């Protein structure tokens, strides 16, 4: 995480129409961790009556009903709910949303699923004529997924890439090695599969997907080097490392920063660097 906004050509506003096939409904749960709030995504083919919802968000009846009414105003019936990962700000409302819409919930983690189908690497969701490709992006959490929407040259990244700042590697569930691999996987989508736009789980849409992902990779390398140097200088506890390395970050975010530091320390140990 960082207090400096990354490149990526972020839009000025959060919420509303993002691409030809996506509309964002912003949940009313702003905080230092969730930024403006959770982005709930309604995804559909323009000429289809069916829509997919990605990350219904927190258990907030008003928000869940707003998602349903927004879909209806677009002439869409919600047919499926997908989860990028299981954190409560993305998934807590999924059960109630399933009751409101009568839809199954698909996720990588079996504990989050409602219905007969989950999600697996290589799956393609085709509801209402859509093509949503499941992309494994563990690291923020072990169950983190992204969804590649080729028709809009976009990728919905959950918390793997945010629209502002950087994300936490939520140790011990999240692992830095996995996260770096996930960023490289997203980078490959921007280099070889035409992805230009990031539709994040929090914050504004990023119109320069490659620039955003490459910033994340560079930022992670920089933070890792800082942590390694801090250890070499004799700082021995995660809290000491946080105070030294994350001095530029709002102290309200230090508990999350400590999770990332623990993940970085594990990574350095695993690779024999400390």
Label each residue range with its predicted role:
Residues 35-36, 56-133, 153:
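Active-site HxH/HxHxD metal-binding segment of metal-dependent hydrolases
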Residues 48-53, 58-61, 131-230:
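Metallo-beta-lactamase
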Residues 84-90, 140, 202, 264:
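Histidine-centered divalent metal-coordination motifs
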Residues 229-274:
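C-terminal regulatory/interaction regions
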